[in-house]
Amino acid sequence: MALMEVNFFSKALMRPVTMNVILPVDKVFFGEETEEENKPFKTLYLLHGVMGNYTDWVTGTCIKRWAEEKNLAVVMPSGANMFYMDHTNANENYSEFIGKELVKITRRMFPLSHKKEDTFIAGLSMGGYGAIRNGLKYHDTFGYIAGLSSAMILEKMRTADDSSPMFFEKKSFLENVFGDLSRIKDCEINPEWIAENMKKDGIPFPHMYLACGLDDPLLPPNRKFRDTMQKLGVDVTYEEGPGAHEWDFWNRYIKRVLDWLPLDKDSKEGMNSGNVGL
């Protein structure tokens, strides 16, 4: 299993950026050959939450081991605290970066499948919002979307003020990220608005997986979002389970995301120090 830290210049962000990439290219199979080596990899673009970066998923979960077991490439970029939105005036176009540039450049760098049905996007909290919104916005690219404890907070944002001790709940911060909070319901900032317009235009929806912990304060808005997606006809798999807004929950449920994705059921785990028997 190759784990790479990759630096490159992003035209969408107009600066160098760093990402982690998991690529199961070096599996060891004693005494046999496998055709897995010649197939382009199905790919998961995996987004972190507020105050995180490209290292979060590798340090907080077992994604590296599970990606090897599933023969899955995983790309983990940094999104700052910008909710994976475009900010054209500041050359901080994170939506374009995630939905277009990152996919294009990783497909040039690595043996990744170019098929929509093999290209997935997921994230937690802020990254869950970013995965859902950009997965719908770039529906020609992503066939599957997954959000864990997703920050579906647009309704709450409309009544925000600056009294919260949490910087990401302050009105001033939210206005800097999302702009005029009075207009967010009826524009592409709102994933529900994107989905409604896709339905009007007869555009097929990506498959969607949503999960949230029973002790997570984001549970009510995630339930509401699930209901809206189901009413629109989105193929939604929804789960709740013990846990709060924490890595213990995300570690368990990112495994469930991988089990839900259309990955190779007959993929074999290579020999490694954890299973070699010595």
Predicted regions and their residues:
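Non-catalytic cap/lid and distal C-terminal segments of serine-dependent acyl enzymes
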Residues: M1-L278
